Amino acid sequence: MKRTRFAYIAGLLVAFGVAGSATAQDNKLRLITWADYVPADVVAQFKKETGIDVEVTLSNNEEMISKLRATGGAGFDLAQPSQDRIVGPQQEFGIYKPMDLTKVKTELFIPSMLDATKKNTTLEGKVYGLPHIWGTDGLVVNTKLAKMTDYTDLCDAKYKGKTSMRLKRPTLLAFAFASGKDPFALYNDPKAYAALMDDVGKTIAACKGNIKFFWDNKDQLLNGARTGEIVGAMMWDTGGWKLNTENADIQYIAPKSGALGWIDTFALPAKGRNDAAAYAWINFNMRPDIAAKVAASAGNFTGSKGADALMDPKLKAQFAKSFSEEALKNVKWYPAVPPGIEDIEGKVLDRVKAAS
């Protein structure tokens, strides 16, 4: 992908510290994060440069919120929730504390991505999140075995028993957009949002005959796609590009109704004990050389300014093939989730799960 494409992405997002050695009692960072975001060589280099050990707990958005809620924000020094999952949980549970931006090397971030994330994670004038990894949800299709252009194609009768998706909120949102509605525009109207989610839930329940399985982890889906058991699925871009590297017939496609765009952040748990180590890790990770290593491990792009120049050319080419400029304009970036929205979605997902 050309560097101008990265600049273009940064422009779209607009519309939408402390380093060094630690004291003896502060030589450990307790990090809760996503799989593949903490490569061993990056941890080793951080330890060598700062003397700080990194204790990693792998998780996801729901588990992060649950763990931090259970402890009142204790147990970890740094968390990596998606940017849309910070303000709502903070309002409800008080599980985070504000960032001290004087301790962050903000010049290391893509300015527009930093501004967008700050905007979406600000509560009562205080910033709670900084951008790290970003990517999208869309369609992964074996183009030799199926033709799909939007999420609802996963329910086409000719692919009965050969498609997959997660039984999670992104699937509800994707099918809402595919129906021609904008679920994000209804976030502040719970009654209308509940009605839309109810309709979407019925659509997905009626589609269950097409679904081989609701995937729980990426390896489950990757293996199904490799064998041809799955011909089309809703999945993260990184999974699609990994499969494409193995089999050129498998493509990651930006759906007609729009890929869903997410940004995973850095956030400070309310009762973290080692903010100094957390800021050191943030600043270390946003260096272009380190960000490129993390990006290679995750298979996604980062908010680090200049890291794109060090990225794998193959990944850049895959991105360019998946996203025309029109498709980039059509990405639906997740806004902050207001309190109560996930309760509505949870009830719908339970009904889909129970449907025969």
Question: What residue ranges belong to the model's regions?
Answer:
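Conserved C-terminal helix/tail region of periplasmic/extracytoplasmic solute-binding proteins
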Residues: 325-356
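A ligand-binding cleft/hinge motif common to bilobed small-molecule-binding domains
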Residues: 85-88, 234-249
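Paired acidic/hydrophobic, glycine-rich loop segments that form the ligand-binding mouth/hinge
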Residues: 76-81, 214, 231-236, 251
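Sec/Tat signal peptide C-region and signal peptidase I cleavage site
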Residues: 18-24
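Early extracytoplasmic/lumenal segment of secretory-pathway proteins
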Residues: 25-89
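Periplasmic-binding protein-like
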Residues: 197-207, 246-270
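Mature extracytoplasmic/periplasmic domains
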Residues: 260, 264, 269-329
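Extracytoplasmic ligand-binding site segments that recognize negatively charged/polar headgroups
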Residues: 80-222
